[in-house]
């Protein structure tokens, strides 16, 4: 039987401060809520980092738990977009920034 690679989801987040600190806060809260084994299964990783925006990835099976951990961390982090590929995530992020400039 073939072993399939697990599916991933990419999340674009806005945070205050360093992106490494935000990722560590997400991982720490995830461990507190669901345990270290679940945190390893979630495979939360930093893909790209910017000044206030970052892209993180996690496994699809653990996505809901990751979103709960993001919601419950302090300082708060906002999830802008979510996608299965980085290319589509960039498009959605661009749509978000276009919409934000139209509103302002």
Model-derived segments and spans:
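Short glycine-/aliphatic-rich beta-strand segments at the starts of folded cytosolic domains
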Residues: 3-20
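Short, surface-exposed beta-edge/turn micro-motifs
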Residues: 8-10, 51-54
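Short amphipathic alpha-helix segments
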Residues: 19-40
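Short amphipathic alpha-helices in soluble, non-transmembrane regions
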Residues: 26, 66-74
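RNA-recognition motif
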Residues: 42-50
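Helix N-cap motif at beta-to-alpha junctions
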Residues: 57-64
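Conserved short beta-strand edge segments in small beta-sheet-based binding/regulatory domains
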Residues: 75-87
């Amino acid at each position: 039987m073939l072993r399939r690679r697990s599916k991933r989801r990419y999340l674009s987040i806005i945070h205050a401060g360093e992106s490494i600190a935000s990722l560590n806060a997400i991982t720490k809260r995830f461990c507190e809520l669901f345990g270290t084994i679940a945190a390893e299964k979630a495979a939360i990783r930093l893909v790209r980092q910017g000044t206030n925006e970052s892209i993180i990835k996690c496994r699809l099976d653990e996505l809901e738990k990751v979103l709960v951990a993001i919601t419950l961390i302090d300082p708060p982090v906002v999830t802008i977009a979510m996608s299965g590929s980085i290319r589509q995530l960039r498009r959605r992020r661009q749509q978000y920034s276009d919409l934000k400039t139209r509103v302002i």
